[in-house]
Amino acid sequence: ATTTPLSPSASESGSYFNPRVLLVDDNAINLKLLVVFAKRQNLRYEEATNGLEAFEIYKSEAKENSNSSPPTRPFDFVLMDLSMPVMDGLTSTRHIRQFESKMGLESCHIVALTGLASAQDQRDAQEAGVDTYLVKPVKFADIKKVFGGT
């Protein structure tokens, strides 16, 4: 996993929103594109190449933050591919949601990035705890909207 702190970006109100984002994709090119997006948006991010690694990073980062009161979620957003080896994105999402519940953490916003476009796939993702469902190829503008950008 790679951590890259970047400078916060100012919102129009003058306040700073500097979200932490977990980028998850087993495809090196797709992951690199997500990193480019994160850098352009001045996001603080971590990378994972499968759902298990993503869940382990999420847990590890949460435990580092466990001294805060109330406990804070380790990431504001997770951009999660769904079709990955070791552990798929839906299983990882379920584990993250269970962990958040167990630890009393505020839920992060999980965005599915997938080539699976059927209505059933979208229902399965929603039931697993996915907040936003984007079908590949995904444009940077679509991801930016999730972060509140235009």
Features from the language model and the residues they span:
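C-terminal compact regulatory domains
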Residues: A1-T150
